[in-house]
């Protein structure tokens, strides 16, 4: 709006519930519903009801027909955070100290999106989160098996748990010079506030992942469509005001290695689709084992921490969500 404050509303008309905005972005001063031409301003106020007096007399008023607003905060890296729960607590309480690990990288200079793509994956959203939360599956990835697992410092890293199910992973150096097609060249372009060629990871419960592999940075978010389908959205970021040379380098590494044309993402997607196919059979494969406990990066504490938080929100144990143990005991 004119006051430069970001507001968020449900994207449907107060009249018949029709979709209002058809595009992901724009500069309209007001939004008009195509169905019956009801209109709203940037504050969500209803400013036009066609033939209001003739059809409704004095039974409704525009001031009562505004759009439904939801909680919105801007911060923690300059991102817009939205929560549809009217009774949710402050954002800072939920995030806690989790993003401190990337505080400098997210706040030193403004960011802008350089890449966006999404996948509709036939799997459960928690299985995707699993691939970002445990490093035991580095054995899945062609590049990680050949490069990451043998790098100095790989095994010394640890997974750190935070309140509300979030985790962070210790940093390590990305060895770009060992990747096929890079002509043995290590990256010299870093990230403001961070190191050159560093790898940092934060998973935020329940559906968000921050991955910095300088010079590239990616943010993953999920929208579950059901128990066996999820939309995963991937956004690549660069530094606003980059030189043309630096921008080209960030785009190249993001898109060709860590983004849509790399190997890691398709390999992860193939794995979780395979899991879902097996689990839907209804046989004994409908469980997940997160039992690794070892003093290394491949400790599976991240997902145990996640499912512990999931159990609190769902008010049922993740290990027995349908209460089958109690039924069996009663029998």
Where are these regions (language model features)?
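Rieske [2Fe-2S] iron-sulfur-binding domain
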Residues: 1-86, 92-96
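C-terminal catalytic domain of Rieske-type non-heme iron oxygenases
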Residues: 11, 73-331
